[in-house]
Amino acid sequence: MGKVVTLGEIMLRLSTPGNTRFVQSDSFDVVYGGGEANVAVSCANYGHEAYFVTKLPKHEIGQSAVNALRKYGVKTDFICRGGDRVGIYYLETGASMRPSKVIYDRAHSAIAEADPCDFDFDAIMEGADWFHWSGITPAISDKAAELTKLACEAAKRHGVTVSVDLNFRKKLWTKEKAQSIMKPLMQYVDVCIGNEEDAELCLGFKPEANVEAGETNAEGYKGIFKAMAKEFGFKYVVSTLRESFSATHNGWKAMIYNGEEFYESKRYDINPIIDRVGGGDSFSGGIIHGLLTKPNQGAALEFAVAASALKHTINGDFNLVSVDEVEALAGGNASGRVQR
């Protein structure tokens, strides 16, 4: 297994119980999560030496976030302690035709105001096999964008494979700001992960699909994958393809391109969805594990898609599944029968 490093923000997630609306709720369910933190948990569950890099306050809420990571085997040696705030997000889980809603309260969080001197990225990347980040981190603040660049530069100095999940968040920045920051960072990236909306808004590649209508067109991606690989020199371009029938019923598959061949995964019909937050992150964790351990891109992709399908059945941000569970589903065991 490898040493995997991720950089980003872990937040306090406050979600309404069940499918109640914000205006109805008298209480919140509390967990922790965040894009790159979720990926680190997945990698730790699969047996990798997973490190999460961030900055968290020294108070009890900051420590609780650290404890949440340690609980699932993520190494916290490179978490800087300081600052005043842990970012928060509020989640209202949708149902049927009513979509889920997220409200962010993350401005001026510790990682958003972190300085380069808070991290020794050369020490962090020493001996690492993989570094993962997402487009959420540079969107948090200009300081976080600079940290992302410095981490990528250190990763390249140490010969570390770099992956990005483009992860566009319209509540954090505009597509113009996103492209001005993200495009220059692509020079450091080996593996680019993103869906149809991310490719368009972060990098300017428009697929032949109606995202809002829940359409996915695998054939329409091939030209885009080739163009992305040619422009930025990616070793792999990977995309999930989600068919959204309702908030609780999705079709789910993915494609990968290695510069020569395309591979499209099997499709999963996920119904009912228990919690789709973290679904993309679980896919990223799966593709990292797959590309580090599997014999070819097809096997890597099948592992990632199965891992992510399982995440949709688990409450919370983290994908709490084992390699054996993922491989059982990837191998065709989707019956859901009791394991005795």
What residue spans do the PLM features occupy?
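Conserved phosphate/ATP/ADP-binding segment of small-molecule kinases
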Residues: 172-260
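Hydrophobic faces of well-ordered beta-strands that scaffold small-molecule active sites
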Residues: 162-164, 192
